[in-house]
Every structure is written in structure tokens, then in C-alpha cells.
Amino acid sequence: MFNNNSLQKLMYLVSPALPVGAYAYSQGLEFAVDGGWLKTEADVSAWIAGVMENSLAELDMPVLVRIYKAWQQGDIEQVKYWNHFLRAGRETHELLLEDDQLGIALKRLLISLEIPHAAEVEKPAFATLFALAGVHWQVPIEQLLQGFAWTWLENQVAAATKLVPFGQTQAQKVILALQPNIAPACEKAFILKDDELGAGLPALAIASAKHERQYSRLFRS
């Protein structure tokens, strides 16, 4: 049941104030702008929508669903299996480093909050412990998945405001324009079978790889 306490815990998890450092990464977006691939608000919006539909909804989100169920069932081996699967899906060193750093930061936080099993996975992906927190705080998977997509979207648009010449008001318009994409992404995450997971985006991988060697960067690599 999605009660007020669960709602408040979900709001805590998706808050930009969560001390995991997600704001420090652009997931290739910085190079895509610097390299001239994205020049306008419409370009950025289309890029973010494409990544959500063809990467987030086909890897991170469906794996989060599986890890959530594994935590519910107390099946640590399945948690570790899908955690490894998710980390193996990172196509560049930069993307893997980001997931590792966010996972370690969230692990440290959940341990300090005395959430059981937070230390079970040695190298947790962010989604692995996001799912654990959701199970512990009794946030239904449907709402947790929406929250996961929302915080990713918000972080991507926040990164874009530092890279593309549009202001905070335009950024809010982009978020609201892309918000309807969350529901179909969640639906896809629930229906994909195990052997359908892990779709890649070559342009995203190239942008991330080139960002690793970009001369001047605002975001971590």
C-alpha cells in the first residue's frame, strides 16, 4: 500500500539533496553539446527522450524491477546476479565509474541509516541500493520506478542547463515536456523479458568515451 510514509520516503530518495553526487555527471551529454551534436533546446530534449526510451527503459529500469523483487524475496544471489548484469552493461569506463561512485555513496548513506543488507553487495550499482531502500521503506515498485526515471530526467536536464544556452524556465519546460515519457518507459520495463534486456546506444557510448578525453570538462569522467 502506498501510504504517506512511503510517499515521503520516495520523495527523499529522488530529492536532488540526496548526497550521492549525481549532479557531477552528464552521461555523455557534455561531449554531445561540445562536439556540436546538440545545439538547441529541441536537440537536447530529443537526446534525453531517446536515451530514456532506448537505454534507461531497456536496461536500468527493468533490472531495477528484478532487483526489487529479489530483495523482497531475500534472494541475495539474484540481487548480485542482476547487479553484475547492470554493471556489465556500462559501455564505457566513465559510465561504469559513475554507477560505482553513486552506488558507493548510496551504500554509505544506507549503512549510516542502519538499513539491513545495505552492505551485502561489494560493488553495488546505484539501482541496486535504490531498490533496497524502496523495499525497506515499502515503496511499491510502480512508484519507485517512476521516481527512478524522474530523478534521472531531472539530473539530465540540470546538466543541460550548464551546457546549452537556455535558462531555468526553459529547463522546467523541457522537464514537463518529457514527463509523459516516464509512463511508457515504466511500462516497457515491466514487460521486457530477461533475454530482451541490455539494448545499447552507440552514439551515447561514443559521446561518453570521447568525454573521457575531452580537454576541458564541467562534469566528472
Swiss-Prot record:
It comes from Saccharophagus degradans (strain 2-40 / ATCC 43961 / DSM 17024). UreD, UreF and UreG form a complex that acts as a GTP-hydrolysis-dependent molecular chaperone, activating the urease apoprotein by helping to assemble the nickel containing metallocenter of UreC. The UreE protein probably delivers the nickel. It is found in: Cytoplasm. It comes from the Bacteria. HAMAP family: UreF. The gene is ureF. Required for maturation of urease via the functional incorporation of the urease nickel metallocenter. InterPro entries: UreF, UreF_sf. This is Urease accessory protein UreF.
